[in-house]
Amino acid sequence: MTIDIRRLRDRLPQEIADLESEARREGHRHIARLIDEWSIGDNRFDRDGERLLGAYVDGELAGIGGMTVETAMSGALRMRRFYIRPAMRGRGIGRMLALALLDHARSFCIVVTVHAGNDGAARFWESLGFQPDGRDGHTHLFALQHHSDDPAASNLHRCVTPRSP
């Protein structure tokens, strides 16, 4: 099994329709919202720090995940529209996709939020180091680590630190 993480830019992949159908069958509407927002231009994951990635297994789209500016928290980014096909779960694809997005975020900020839609998603995000923090529309926070020799540290003035409870 070969896993390839690709940046999605100019257009959504054709296979997104299959992903959306599978998500809808599971009761999830966030992939349909991704398609709708993309088609009308509301969200193309093209602002500073934003990114949309597709996870491909042996050339087939297995999942998708994005990072957008977190509007409820100054300087933070938010994981969005994250979905892995049910048949592809448990193979490390979601973890690889999430870690690629977190690695990207390190150049832009020190806090990433996510809204875990169910208990399984909450366990997944917590396994990556996200901490429960249910406010401002998100359920979890992740504090990214910067090192003093990290060139991204110069971006810290634009970011926030997690608030105390």
Indicate where each model-derived feature is located.
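Conserved N-terminal entry element of GNAT/NAT acetyltransferase domains
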Residues: 1-14, 18, 147-165
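Conserved acetyl-CoA-binding loop of GNAT-fold acetyltransferases
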Residues: 126-136
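Conserved acetyl-CoA pyrophosphate-binding loop and the N-cap/start of the following alpha-helix
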Residues: 87-100
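Hydrophobic adenine-recognition pocket in adenosine-nucleotide-binding enzymes
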Residues: 82-84
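Acetyl-CoA-dependent GNAT
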Residues: 3-75, 80, 104
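Conserved beta-strand-loop-alpha-helix junction that forms the acyl-donor binding cleft
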Residues: 89, 112-123, 138-141, 145
